[in-house]
Amino acid sequence: MKSLNVLLIFSILSLVGCSSPSPNIQPRAKFGLLFPDSIGIATMESAYRTAPRYVPGASQIGMFPQIALRRLEFFDEQTCSVTEPMRAYGSMQARDLNALTDFCLRQQVASKVEPTKGQAMQQSIDVFFATDRKELRDGAILGFGNERGSFSVGLVQVSIPREHKLGAVERWSSSTLWPRRSEDGFEILSIRLQGQQSFFQQTKEQLQNSKERRAFIFVHGYNVSFADAALRTAQLALDLDPEALPVFFSWPSQGAMQAYPVDSQNAEWTEANLQKFLETFGSTSGAESIVVIAHSMGSRPAMRALAKVLDKRRDLRSKFKELVLAAPDIDADVFVRDLVPAYVALRMPVTLYASAKDKALQLSKQFNGSPRAGDANPRPPVIAGIETVDATDIDTDFLGHAYVAETRALLTDVTLLIKNRLRATDRPGLLKVDAGAGLSFWRFKK
């Protein structure tokens, strides 16, 4: 069977070369003189990659570019705007709000990795997980396989690459001549199983430092291993909302392109476990603002499980703020007839991202004999009570199925949705489209 899901591996961006101005000029002045005529995102990219050169001692400790840019005080993270010093030196004149917000996302990563005085540079992130996959052991826990297993929770420590491109899950390449280093890419450093009491005690402790106590729960799709899900969640944590608690639920996908029928059965089987986890997380984790992000086939159990939780536990409705459906591989008729009405009745916000270029969902349509909710051909599903975003015009991989996690415009839009709580009508990158009968959907501006 042809692949229904391909996750491309992106290479790490190379550093931009430039000559250093006179050493008697102050760091910010030095930095500004390098880019006197540039405008927009190209300047921001150059500034991002070269900033460590102009912070004393940065190269000796391997300072992250995000941190160096903060030290130079060229960017205001709170307002996502350029500071006056940077404007004064002509380094950047960003006029595009989406590009500016995108760059702001990079800077917020620094809050995760900048050490306090006397600490070593943090180069990893802890990602919380729940899974019903079978454990892989050799005495100690090695990971989780593709078979059904008992329910487990714990933490995965994932390395953070020094140079991270928005939307990419960079991985170390075996073809390189350089020795392997964890900071070269996303990599699982350790897996720690925990009891539920210890697990939720740790979520509470981490959320205590968060003003809004935000968390997101990622439910992956078809053809995804446990390791793939962990690395993708770490990438989403960096790119979407570094201040939110990153959590993923991993069901027993076979991690194989030809195993679509088995994955489909397991996605149905996992629903009860996911429902139990969502309910327990909502009531026990300490999070006050929870977003569920479901991709592809993972949207099936996620939609049903969350609706049951919210119907059963009225006290949790205020905590679950949004359900984001990214390219959902759900029968479109079932979606409209059975699933959406439940969320409309619950007054639960739902955002659907769909694309007419999603070849994976087109293949799924052929396999299942029915159109899919994430397929925007000839147009996306437009239903009263949910917000639909047509991402057809966004450049994606050749299957166009992982676009929400991998493309700049999509990541920016999702961030404005889940972190800034902006509805589609208020997000600057979207254009409202009249669908008739008093209904509307949104497209990305060209």
Where are these regions (language model features)?
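Gly/Ala-rich beta-loop-alpha elbow adjacent to hydrolase catalytic centers
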Residues: A294, G298, A302
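Short substrate-entry loop that stabilizes the transition state in hydrolases
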Residues: S225-A229
